[in-house]
Swiss-Prot record:
This is Non-structural protein 1. One of its GO terms (biological process) is symbiont-mediated suppression of host type I interferon-mediated signaling pathway. The gene is NS. A motif (Nuclear localization signal) lies at residues 50-55. Its main location: host cell. The lineage of its organism: Viruses, Riboviria, Orthornavirae, Negarnaviricota, Polyploviricotina.
Amino acid sequence: MADNMTTTQIEVGPGATNATINFEAGILECYERLSSQRALDYPGQDRLNRLKRKLESRIKTHNKSEPESKRMSLEERKAIGVKMMKVLLFMNPSAGIEGFEPYCMKNSSNSNCPNCNWTDYPPTPGKCLDDIEEEPENVDDPTEIVLRDMNNKDARQKIKEEVNTQKEGKFRLTIKRDIRNVLSLRVLVNGTFLKHPNGYKSLSTLHRLNAYDQSGRLVAKLVATDDLTVEDEEDGHRILNSLFERFNEGHSKPIRAAETAVGVLSQFGQEHRLSPEEGDN
């Protein structure tokens, strides 16, 4: 087990891979501490969750190639990563920052703050759908599409035609999938299109994507974050088409809203935006 933050020795193991993993684990710890102080915005929270998933996967793979005696958990690597940062930033592992004290849980086992184990920090507050602010729905000339008992090919073609006729600027697109007289899911998309000199239109930003179940309850909500900004012209239509195809797969019974929401969120690595109850449904 890694020692606490006052230890001066850094044991990063052989090779750059161990050093990199440990350093990124230290970055994750910093993100989590900032989050525990409620000082991390939503894009930052997204990056925290992505980094944690990436590290967990990478550590699992890397440990398979290491002897059992050298395998380390994410928490152990966090401790090493934090110590690496202290050396890199201050060139003195015992150096402190004036006016700053590490966060410490005040309990009987950790009453002495300088000697407490830095891994004892509160869990990151959970984010549920209602915690996320969204842009207003006011968009000029919103487009609504109702797909009634269409086969997949016709449904996708109708959506594609509507998307391609959007003007430059912000738009709102509402999609209702009605299969065998069952309104299974309603999807609201807000975004911004750019019109290029050659006449080509691309989606520059996906501001929001909401999915509602049969009772009108919001089951998935995506809002403007760094992850939802389209990086190149082709991405806009690719993202929309992949989402629309997901919604318009043929089903003989109502689509499970929660399952579909998870599918939508996974397009952006945003599964954590579902509350625990919604994720389990």
